[in-house]
Amino acid sequence: MQADFVIIGSGSAGSALAYRLSEDGANSVVVLEFGGSDVGPFIQMPAALAWPMSMNRYNWGYLSEPEPNLNNRRITAPRGKVIGGSSSINGMVYVRGHSEDFDRWEELGAKGWAYADVLPYYKRMEHSHGGEEGWRGTDGPLHVQRGPVKNPLFHAFIEAGKQAGFEVTEDYNGSKQEGFGLMEQTTWRGRRWSAASAYLRPALKRPNVELVRCFARKIVIENGRATGVEIERGGRTEVVRANREVIVSASSFNSPKLLMLSGIGPAAHLQEMGIDVKADRPGVGQNLQDHMEFYFQQVSTKPVSLYSWLPWFWQGVAGAQWLFFKRGLGISNQFESCAFLRSAPGVKQPDIQYHFLPVAISYDGKAAAKSHGFQVHVGYNLSKSRGDVTLRSSDPKADPVIRFNYMSHPEDWEKFRHCVRLTREIFGQKAFDLYRGPEIQPGEKVRTDEEIDAFLREHLESAYHPCGTCKMGAKDDPMAVVDPETRVIGVDGLRVADSSIFPHITYGNLNAPSIMTGEKAADHILGKQPLARSNQEPWINPRWAVSDR
């Protein structure tokens, strides 16, 4: 089997690549995907988002190594093992990122990836329903919309932010990210709208695109050039040949793993694993970044939360409403209001993110208390902690070794303590007087730095946004893995295009910038002139130097 382009992975970036590389019919494309079908209610029903992430059928099920700053807990690190990749099992939250994120990328060596460069690609990919005119795309393949916003708690959260003196944004994916507002989701007509829905499924209708279900073992490199991918299917090993290029879009865990299995990575580590070194790139697997979060939970004194729908019977009712009529609670991920805030004066861009949920539940989906409640997922999104991904052995089937090294920087502790205290201030506003009951978590008695730190060590979890392990940068940067055109430095005919190439984590959920990366990488691969830079100026809080709001 052969094709002009062989793409490893059908996730957020891989699906976009398949769609764009095959668009004019001139190139043949093969997409390699180990995971199975994304058709089924657990994936397609937005409200069922917790199910696919917890099912081995759809999830690689990775765990970190014991994290020393989190009581040696092994942190769950899910990645999609299904058509559509993690876009088929994620929370469907749509956040482009802040303009400062991408300007920082360019400062770190990713020339041509500043905000003015990437904004046109966001517009190209979007079909925004109700976004800010002039800042949003309206005819792209990816449907983006707000939820029904019927629960009064969503509005109470936004009003509380206003009362606390914070900004309100009408569209955080438009000109102004900072503030409280309504959250956007990748859903359409009551269904999850994944990268597979938006990109891969339409691409597969073309005669020049083929999806191959298989396990990718390694990239074949001959005389310094990637010529194909060694795969395993049906108990046999074979090679899929690439006439032009191989593109790795396998996630921030599996992309560096594949490079290292293929002999591209830190030479000493590869030799330790018994792998012949094809290209000594010390940055492969390094620079691992992620967002962390905790749940801040409160009892609701009014029976307005989703608590009544948690019993199995009522979940069945909601499921039936969705299955037969595509209406009711099932059509939304239930994250329908949010906030993007700055942690202190002198911080130019938002660095704290809130997802508001009108129910108090634990990570396993069970009620956090035997009562109505509400919660926010709170995270400091610009952590300075860095981790790495390495090989466990030379066996392609072995899970990678994942060390996030969470909370290894003192500033992370300061910022997360602030998150706890700031959330108490927000929930203490008049807008919540009608609903506010006792604090469930962290708990009223958790007040001092030491008490908050103890809570964080036990309750911080990943927000499932790993990135950075195949860093994009200048060719003379020894830790860069790919150049600004996504070419692997030191190997011809090979690119990486997914969240692993982010030089620095973006502020917000990573599905949107991952898809954008696939969109932009496709133009580089095809040798097209990049889309014209935008001259639009995003809103920056004029008080940023002197106030946090």
Swiss-Prot record:
The keyword NAD applies. Belongs to the GMC oxidoreductase family. The active site is at H465 (proton acceptor). FAD binds at residues 4-33. One of its GO terms (molecular function) is flavin adenine dinucleotide binding. One of its GO terms (biological process) is glycine betaine biosynthetic process from choline. The lineage of its organism: Bacteria, Pseudomonadati, Pseudomonadota, Alphaproteobacteria, Hyphomicrobiales. Its cofactor is FAD. Pfam families: GMC_oxred_C, GMC_oxred_N. The gene is betA. It is an enzyme of class 1 (oxidoreductase). Its EC number is 1.1.99.1, 1.2.1.8. This is Oxygen-dependent choline dehydrogenase. SUPFAM superfamilies: FAD-linked reductases, C-terminal domain, FAD/NAD(P)-binding domain. Involved in the biosynthesis of the osmoprotectant glycine betaine. Catalyzes the oxidation of choline to betaine aldehyde and betaine aldehyde to glycine betaine at the same rate. The keyword Transferase does not apply. Keywords: FAD, Flavoprotein, NAD, Oxidoreductase. Pathway: Amine and polyamine biosynthesis; betaine biosynthesis via choline pathway; betaine aldehyde from choline (cytochrome c reductase route): step 1/1. It catalyses: choline + A = betaine aldehyde + AH2; betaine aldehyde + NAD(+) + H2O = glycine betaine + NADH + 2 H(+).
